[in-house]
A protein has these predicted regions:
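Non-heme Fe(II)/2-oxoglutarate
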Residues: 1-38
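Extracellular structured ligand-interaction cores
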Residues: 34-36, 45-47, 69-73, 80, ...
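Short, flexible loop/turn elements at secondary-structure junctions
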Residues: 41-43, 54, 74-80, 105-107, ...
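Conserved short histidine dyad/triad with adjacent acidic residue
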Residues: 39-67
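A short beta-strand-loop-beta hairpin characteristic of the jelly-roll/cupin
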Residues: 69-96
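A short hydrophobic beta-strand segment most commonly corresponding to one strand
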Residues: 70-75, 100-102, 116-132
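Conserved metal-binding segment of the jelly-roll/cupin
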Residues: 93-109
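Short proline/glycine-enriched turn/loop segments at secondary-structure junctions
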Residues: 109-115
């Protein structure tokens, strides 16, 4: 995965999530003990190159293995021209705020914001048994 320290300025980590975000994740259907999450803030000109996450924090927090997790990406803002999220061979654009995308823990993925508006999303590492 990407270096946690290198991307700290662009994230709100699980241990610092506001109550409103925790409540929102609960509304999606995930109780606090089944996930680890962070808010991604991607400003214009920023990107997260192609990578696989190691889910290290989630594994440690929930005492589970890497293979036990799936990722859920929730877009918090509507898509703007110049923004893209990619997972394996698929590139996603034109999302609406609240749209969710689920992918396997081992999938390669990336994100780029070449537009003029900041992109906000929540990334959730959730135990597979809780995915409906």
């Amino acid at each position: 995965g990407l270096d946690r320290v290198a991307s700290t300025q662009n994230k709100v980590w699980d241990e610092n999530l506001p109550d409103e975000v925790i409540d929102f994740i609960k509304e999606i259907g995930f109780e606090r003990g089944c996930y680890s999450a962070n808010i991604n803030v991607q400003r214009p000109g920023q990107m997260a190159p192609l990578h696989r996450d190691n889910h290290g924090y989630a594994c440690k927090k929930l005492n589970k293995q890497f293979e036990d997790f799936e990722r859920v990406l929730v877009f918090l803002t509507d898509w703007e021209v110049g923004q893209v999220f990619g997972c394996e061979k698929e590139c996603i654009t034109d999302w609406k705020s609240g749209d969710c995308y689920t992918f396997d823990a081992q999938d390669q993925h990336f994100s780029a914001n070449t537009g003029i508006e900041t992109k906000y999303s929540i990334v959730i590492s959730v135990l597979k048994e809780y995915i409906k």
